[in-house]
Swiss-Prot record:
Protein name: Protein O-mannosyl-transferase 1
Entry's Gene Ontology cellular component terms: acrosomal vesicle; dolichyl-phosphate-mannose-protein mannosyltransferase complex; endoplasmic reticulum; endoplasmic reticulum membrane; membrane; sarcoplasmic reticulum
Main enzyme class: transferase
Gene: POMT1
Keyword Endoplasmic reticulum: yes
Localization per Swiss-Prot or TrEMBL: Endoplasmic reticulum membrane
Amino acid sequence: MWGFLKRPVVVTADINLSLVALTGMGLLSRLWRLTYPRAVVFDEVYYGQYISFYMKQIFFLDDSGPPFGHMVLALGGYLGGFDGNFLWNRIGAEYSSNVPVWSLRLLPALAGALSVPMAYQIVLELHFSHCAAMGAALLMLIENALITQSRLMLLESVLIFFNLLAVLSYLKFFNCQKHSPFSLSWWFWLTLTGVACSCAVGIKYMGVFTYVLVLGVAAVHAWHLLGDQTLSNVGADVQCCMRPACMGQMQMSQGVCVFCHLLARAVALLVIPVVLYLLFFYVHLILVFRSGPHDQIMSSAFQASLEGGLARITQGQPLEVAFGSQVTLRNVFGKPVPCWLHSHQDTYPMIYENGRGSSHQQQVTCYPFKDVNNWWIVKDPRRHQLVVSSPPRPVRHGDMVQLVHGMTTRSLNTHDVAAPLSPHSQEVSCYIDYNISMPAQNLWRLEIVNRGSDTDVWKTILSEVRFVHVNTSAVLKLSGAHLPDWGYRQLEIVGEKLSRGYHGSTVWNVEEHRYGASQEQRERERELHSPAQVDVSRNLSFMARFSELQWRMLALRSDDSEHKYSSSPLEWVTLDTNIAYWLHPRTSAQIHLLGNIVIWVSGSLALAIYALLSLWYLLRRRRNVHDLPQDAWLRWVLAGALCAGGWAVNYLPFFLMEKTLFLYHYLPALTFQILLLPVVLQHISDHLCRSQLQRSIFSALVVAWYSSACHVSNTLRPLTYGDKSLSPHELKALRWKDSWDILIRKH
C-alpha cells in the first residue's frame, strides 16, 4: 500500500546559468565595499534628511517626486535600525556610528545589480539572440556611471530598475498573448506591468516618461486586436472572461471578445497604477504624522491634522466664526510665502518714491510670521460691541462684516486710491479719521468659496472665504510684491477690482480663533495673547490631504540657481560633463559620476544607425521592396519602439524643462540606448553582412569594440569606486576631455 513512498522522487530544475552568472556579477559590482566611503556623498545629503524625517515620523514636503522613492530609502534605514539622528548638513561629513551606511545604500545597489539580468531578459523577449542579450547585460554591468549611481543612497538606480521591469513585464505579457491569453502567466505579467509603471512614477516624476511609452505601445497593440477577426465583439463572452473558471477555456477559444482584452488592459495599466499611486501617499501620510519644518507650506486645515505644531495651537478652538470672534486670517495661496493678514501702527508714506501720493492711512500687509498684530475682530456693522454674544451668532455666507484690527481697533478699509506697488489695484488700509472729507469704507461681504450644500456658516480652518468690498466690489487680495523698507519688506495687500474667479491669492481661511469676551481694549489685548480653548474635532479626509499635498508638490518650485556641476541635455549625449561626487579629506581618492565614453558614443551611433536604416526600409517598403522577412521586420520595429522610443521619451523632455539639470538625469535614457546597441549590431550581422567572411570580420570588430569598453571601464575604476588615491599625473591622464572636472589637490 505504501510502496509508492519507496519510489525515487525526481525534481527537474531549469536553470539559466547565464542569468545566474549575470546576477552574481551584478551583485558583486554593486555591493563590493558598499560602505566605502563612510561619508556623505553628493545628494546623499539631500535624501538623508528625508530618511531622518521618516525615522522620526515628521512631516515633510519634497517637490522632486512622489514619496515612494523616499520610502524605499527609508526602508533601508529602518532595516538597519537607524534612529534618524544625524545632521545632514555637509557633503563629505563622516557618518557617525549610529548610521547604518550599508543598509541605507543596499536597496539602490540591489536595484542596480538586478538591472543587469533584466537587460539580458528584455533582449531575449524581443526575440534576439542570447549573444545579443549577453552583450546588453555586460554593457549594463561595466558602465561606470550606472555603477557609481547605484552604489550610493540615490534614486536613479531604483527608477531604472522599475523602468526595465515595466518593459520586461510588458514584453512577457505580449509574448503570452500570442499563445496563452488570459492564462495565469498572462494576468501576472500584465498586472506586474501596471505595478512597475506605478512604482516608476512613484520613485520620480521622470517615471511618467516610461509609463507613457508602455501605454503607447500597449495602445498600438490593442488597436491591432480590434482588427483580429478571430475575436468576437462584446457579447456573451463578457461574463465568462470575468470568471476564473473560464480563463483556462478562453485561452483556447477563438471567440474571446475584444471587450475582455481592452477591459483587462484598462484595469491593469490604468486603474492599478492610480490605486497604487494613491496608496503611496496614504502610507506616506500615515508614517509622517508629526508636525515638521515644512508645515507652513500647507494649509491651516492640513497643519491642524498633524500632531503638534498648529494642531497643538488650534486644538479646541471654536468651530463656527461668530460676530465678535477674534481670528487670524491666512492667505490660502501662500505665494511667495505663507502669510497672515497683518497691520501695525505705521502709515503709508504721504508720497511714494515714484511721486504718487497715498491716503496716509494705517498700513495693512501680509506677514509671514505669527504675531499678535495678525489678530482681527469680526464685527457686526449694526452693533457696537466687539464681543461674542450669548448664544453666539454665527457669520454666514453673504453677511456684511467689519474687520477690526485687534491691537489698534481700526477697521479694514479700501477706497479709490492706488496701491503702493500695484497702481492698477486699490490701496487697503486700516481707517484713520483725519477729520477730512474721506469717509470710512469698511464694509465687506463674506463669500464662502467652498461652502457645502447643507450649511453656509463660516468655519474655522475649514472654510475658504473671500472678502468683497461693498462700496467698490474690490476683493481683498495678496499681490505677492514685497513692500520697501517703510513697509518692513512685508507683502502687499490690495483691493482687486478686476478679479475673476476664485484665485487662491484672494481666498483666506481662519487659522486661529477664539470667542472674545471683553469690551475693554487692555483686557482684549490680554485675551489675544492667550486664546481660550473649546474642544472641536477637525479631521481632513485622505483625499483632501492627498489633493493638497500633490498640488503643493507640483506648484512648489525649488531654488533652481546655477550649480557648479549643472549641465545641459546637449552635453549628455557626448559625455562633455561629469560630476565630482566626493573627495577624500586627506588623499586624492575621489568619486565621479563619469560614464564609459565608448558605450555612450556607441549608443548615440546606434540610435543614428537605427533611424537611418528604418527610414531606408520604410522607403523601400513603400516601393513594395521588402528587404526583411515579416517576422524580422516586426522584431525590428518593436525593438525600436521600446529601445529608441525609451531613449527619446526619457531624454527629449529635458529640453523643455526650466530646472537645474545634472548628468544623472540622462541615465534612464542611457539604459535604453544600451538595450538598442546589441539589437543594431545583431541586425547588421544577420541582414547586412552578405557573406560568412563579412560576418567573421564584423564579429571580430565587435569583440575589439567591447574590449575597448572594458578597458575604459577598468581605467576609470578609481573614479567609479573612489578606493584608490591617484597621483596628480595619473589624474591629469584621466582628463580625456577639457570639460571634465577632475579634482587635483595643490600641495
